[in-house]
Amino acid sequence: MLITLLISLILLSRGKADFTLEIYRELLSALSKKGYQFMTFEQYCQLKASLPKKFVILRHDVDLKAINSLQTAQVEHELGVKASYYFRVVPQSNQPEIIRAIAALGHEIGYHYEDMAIADGNVEIAIAHFQEQLAYF
């Protein structure tokens, strides 16, 4: 509830949706000031039995412009925030130098899988494709 309210207030504060890094920085700062702890998906899984009362899992699916994700990761790093970045294995997203740079900032890297869609619903092909792609990461 509070997160929805914060997002609404920040993004609509200027009368229109604003998805700039400046506004994202404000959102992260506001959540931090309200006592929210940020964690990666892996941290969430590890802490399940003892999660803090207020927490945010930041998960980013990198679909198109990987450079934008690097800029987002840099903002998070400056604020001491860790996030999870899931990359597709397509040219727009799969840029190893950017993936390494985001990982070097301390963020979690994962495979944004879409194997069933790629395999057109064929489970055997999807599993084989998944194993191939997962080995990449």
Positions of predicted regions on the chain:
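Catalytic alpha-helical scaffold of carbohydrate-active enzymes acting on polysaccharides/glycoconjugates
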Residues: 1-137
